[in-house]
Design a protein with these regions (language model features):
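Single-stranded nucleic acid-binding surfaces, predominantly the OB-fold ssDNA-binding core
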Residues: 1-78
Length: 78
């Protein structure tokens, strides 16, 4: 068995979208960007942005929808 874990630190790219399943469970989706500074072949630093799609469920989904908005800093672990 293998186990993978990811930690993301970045900012929301758009406002969270809250919806509910037919069973009544809250689901919140948003995009977030992480930024990294890397040297290119010429030795100059370049900012590299990577985008992630994030989905939260139930109470976390409701809290994210209530307290986060585009540009909010976020820490995601999962």
């Amino acid at each position: 068995m293998s186990f993978n874990k990811i930690i993301l630190v970045g900012n929301l790219g758009r406002d969270p979208e809250l919806r509910y399943t037919p069973q009544g469970d809250a689901v919140c989706s948003f995009s977030m960007a992480t930024n990294e500074r890397k040297k290119d072949k010429s030795g100059e630093f370049q900012d590299v942005t990577t985008w992630f799609k994030v989905t939260l469920w139930r109470r976390q989904a409701e809290n994210a929808s209530k307290y986060l908005s585009k540009g909010s800093p976020v820490y995601i672990e999962g």
